[in-house]
């Protein structure tokens, strides 16, 4: 009876696969078996408890009680005598969202979807809600289990039980790799294999991946893949932030993603599904037994499981080819050219994916685990050193609980953000080979801020210093320099020297600049304590062009002097002023 029921469930799943385009959104949607349904319910209940009580945990008794009510409620069976747990609606919503985000359907969803197909319902008419309930709850195998309790436990039986546990673990790991290869959104499968073999990706790495997946609303595997692709191909401009917590796990994540890429390459490059399936299993097996002792039970279990699955894949492919041959006897062998092109390019590896889906469906239709406590709470590190239970992996602190220190002041937060921007700009900026002759951007910005905030040296002083290179006071108390009257004069000897030099070098641009600079050195300012009045600067007769340029420079000096508010004399200027006043 048990075998018949399991075969009927497998036929139901096959019917679902034939009509996947009308029943689901993706061909790679995987079916969630009884054990995976119970694990998903456990995580949903723990998440609900965390939202209401703050602790990501749930007791075994509550899970068993909720599991019983969940099966009756979802199969539309009477639930009068079953106690319902608090917040069941929230738990059910979390469960449905988890399966939807993981691109999975449980056996009850498959049964309901197939029930809507009225044309082919006779293929699984022997499946009723009550029988499906008995299968999922394990009642179909209760009679077989009664004989086991009467037998005494011997050392040999204990040894056999340990070997069976190791073999089940190896089987679960290999199936999880195949499941993730087919369905990249399956977070439950990723939790089983993220750190097997050891990649340094423990609870902390899984917690960081989970937080990033929630922020980006993506699956954990896609978040890890996106992060590694950004590191490898993005460049400095698109590199993740230096404070990204995933940077601490680059080595392990890169190892994991590259291994999955290797499996994807085999899936896409090898057209023969039988050969591709064998190579995929061989690569997974070599990865798991690398560095292991050949006498280790886990080593032997991995080899046995890989060999068994390889044989099952070959049988599945042979049966599929036989079904295709029978179904196409009355169809013309001529195919459109587009059909050939699509199957040769875009759908490369599709036959292998179909074979792997059948293998995963057979596992989903298998009987549930007898020991629920061992399934839900037993840490896998008792068998494998890097194994951790799923509940332990998903139990993590929220991002708000990572740092319990009080919020920093606004000034410190602004300063920190500005420093991060400066670091990022320095990393991405392209500098010239002569950049050493210029000031850094941060120094220039600092000088600008100092000039703006300084009350004693306004910005107009900078313009004066650019106009007059030497000898001009940049902080005279608002004088107006003109040509009509004043009390500043040039010495006779100096005037004769300037006249001779300007007359001999007329027309030379560099000489004109020297002449202007020499004239500027002799422009002296009075004491700022004197009352405001017009000043005069007597200039020797020179060429007309030189005179116009000098007048324009003096006017600019006059405008800039209006902005000054304080006297500031250079060294020796007082003596020169007294000398020329004589």
Curated annotation (Swiss-Prot):
Domain of life: Eukaryota
Keyword Magnesium applies: no
Subcellular locations according to the entry: Cytoplasm; Nucleus
GO cellular component entries: chromatin; cytoplasm; nucleus
UniProt-listed GO biological process terms: DNA repair; negative regulation of double-strand break repair via homologous recombination
Biased composition (Polar residues): 471-487, 501-510
Sorted UniProt keywords: Cytoplasm, DNA damage, DNA repair, DNA-binding, Nucleus
Key word Membrane present: no
GO molecular function: DNA binding
Ranges for region Disordered: 471-514
Gene3D superfamilies: PCRA, domain 4
Protein family (similarity comment): Belongs to the PARI family.
Functional note: Required to suppress inappropriate homologous recombination, thereby playing a central role DNA repair and in the maintenance of genomic stability. Antagonizes homologous recombination by interfering with the formation of the RAD51-DNA homologous recombination structure. Binds single-strand DNA and poly(A) homopolymers. Positively regulate the poly(ADP-ribosyl)ation activity of PARP1; however such function may be indirect.
Subunit structure: Interacts with RAD51 and PCNA. Interacts with PARP1. Interacts with TASOR.
UniProt name for this protein: PCNA-interacting partner
Taxonomic source organism: Bos taurus (Bovine)
Gene: PARPBP
